[in-house]
UniProtKB/Swiss-Prot annotation:
Entry keywords, A to Z: Methyltransferase, Mitochondrion, rRNA processing, S-adenosyl-L-methionine, Transferase, Transit peptide
E.C. number: 2.1.1.-
CDD domains, per the entry: SpoU-like_MRM1 (cd18105)
NCBIfam families per record: rRNA_methyl_3 (TIGR00186)
Molecular function in Gene Ontology: RNA binding; rRNA (guanine) methyltransferase activity; rRNA (guanine-N1-)-methyltransferase activity
Entry similarity comment: Belongs to the class IV-like SAM-binding methyltransferase superfamily. RNA methyltransferase TrmH family.
Native source species: Schizosaccharomyces pombe (strain 972 / ATCC 24843) (Fission yeast)
Residue range of the transit peptide in the UniProt record, numbered on this chain: 1-11
Region described as Disordered: spans on this chain: 121-141
Cellular component per GO, a single term: mitochondrion
Major place of residence: mitochondrion
UniProt protein name: rRNA methyltransferase 1, mitochondrial
PANTHER family referenced in this protein's UniProt entry, alphabetically: RRNA METHYLTRANSFERASE 1, MITOCHONDRIAL (PTHR46103:SF1)
Biological process according to GO: mitochondrial ribosome assembly; mitochondrial RNA processing; rRNA methylation; rRNA modification
Length: 301
């Protein structure tokens, strides 16, 4: 069962909170506990969160993060605690001996994409592209043209969400766009599953998904919905290779959903449809994070 705005701070047992209260006097109600080396280091480096305290398991990790903070010229308290306490504040998730107490991510909400189709995109002269001010985050391919965004709708598993974000960042998407109501909360679990990509990537919420996608098509964006190629399907369904060739020079939004498929009202807003060949009546689809990797690799490269 998915709870709205899952917060690891609220999942911490009272016993653990009591112990940490003795050490820090107070844990803020809006605190989250970011865990894992990559997620913690990226959160500290980008400072998209208010970083409040580090909890480390041993002297070696203490020294590692003390040196890391010195390089960043950033000062926050580093508290040495035992593994049991780290297990408690992370609900026994794999934390690598380090946990960061921080505020939740402040994800902006947008109504449309500012980058119109056909506009020249070139950062070599030092000018920023209009769609780069969606967020203070980054992409791994800031100079790529045409741009590709990933719109996510209906992914309620935090591991899948993290894996999609990680693939999108590594494979060169410009950013992640999320519906507010139909996805898992961007929790520290998502951050860990993304190998810390959540902390650095361009990520925005979309105010009204149907209006957003419809307006994007009108502006010239090619909105590509993922859809199984069933025999009775009347829509033209592209393979990844064919849609790459067809839309090579067009700005794109790849729309991904759960394994149940995209909602009908989202599918109707898409300008194109793509399906990865394979499967049968027993297993007819890939995990969404695997599908995301295949499609992104094809579309970006």
């Amino acid at each position: 069962m998915i709870r709205s705005r899952v917060n690891l701070a609220r999942e911490v047992p009272k016993k653990a909170k009591a112990h940490l209260s003795k050490e820090r006097r107070l844990i803020k109600e809006d605190s989250e506990f970011v865990f894992g080396t990559h997620s913690v280091k990226n959160a500290l480096a980008t400072r998209k969160r208010e970083c409040r305290a580090l909890y480390v398991q041993n002297a070696d990790i203490h020294s590692e993060f003390e040196e890391f903070l010195n390089k960043l010229q950033y000062k926050i308290p580093i508290k040495s605690v035992n593994k049991e306490h780290l297990n408690q504040i992370t609900a026994c998730r794999p934390h690598n001996g380090v946990v960061l107490e921080a505020s939740s991510l402040n994800v902006p909400t947008i109504s449309d994409l500012l980058f119109p189709a056909g506009e020249e995109y070139n950062n070599k002269n030092g000018q920023d592209s209009p769609h780069n001010d969606l967020n203070e985050g980054k992409s791994s391919s800031s100079d790529n043209y045409p741009p590709l965004y990933v719109y996510v709708d209906g992914i309620t598993d935090p591991q899948n969400m993290g894996a999609v974000i990680r693939s999108a960042y590594i494979l060169g998407a410009k950013g992640i766009l999320l519906s507010k109501k139909h996805n898992t909360f961007l929790s520290p679990v998502v951050s860990k599953a993304s190998a810390g990509a959540l902390e650095v990537f361009n990520i925005s919420h979309v105010k009204n998904p149907m209006v957003f996608l419809r307006n994007s098509v009108l502006k010239g964006w090619k909105v590509i919905g993922t859809k199984p190629a069933l025999p009775d399907n009347k829509d033209q369904i592209y393979t990844p290779h064919k849609i790459k060739t067809e839309l090579m020079n067009e700005p794109k939004i790849l729309v991904l959903g759960s394994e149940k498929g995209l909602r009908t009202n989202i599918l109707t807003q898409c300008s194109h449809y793509v399906s990865i060949p394979g499967g049968d009546k027993y297993v007819d689809s890939l995990n969404v994070s695997v599908a995301a990797g295949i499609l992104l690799y094809s579309l970006v490269n």
